[in-house]
Amino acid sequence: VLEMHHRTKRDAPSGTALTLAAAAREARLGPGRASGAPGVSAAGALPETAPAGARRDGEIGFAAVRAGDIVGEHTVLFTGAGEQLFLTHRALDRAIFARGALAAALWLQSRPAGRYGMGDVVLAKTNT
């Protein structure tokens, strides 16, 4: 999982990067089998905390860049022998985050009290 954000962002890897890695791990292991399973490391996230040496087979690694005024970019890289697949989302304007928050607030108005995440909002919008 490769991610880039503005130079003042404090966490690395970001919460979104960790969520993407968890989803990839669950897809690999199957629903409900990824909880607590090894396979996600912060290798490469920060030079001062990156472990030395190669990652283990099947382990999901991270690379984090903090530079300039980058709004946000996340790439999930899938590799195989002689091939690579990059899936990238790039936020070019922080206004998209405000639009997402407003859409979530509107969606919540018609829901019973409970704990929801943005995944619930996105799934509801794609199923309508």
Task: Provide a role label for each language-model segment.
Residues V1-T128:
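C-terminal substrate-binding/catalytic lobe of Rossmann-fold NAD(P)-dependent oxidoreductases
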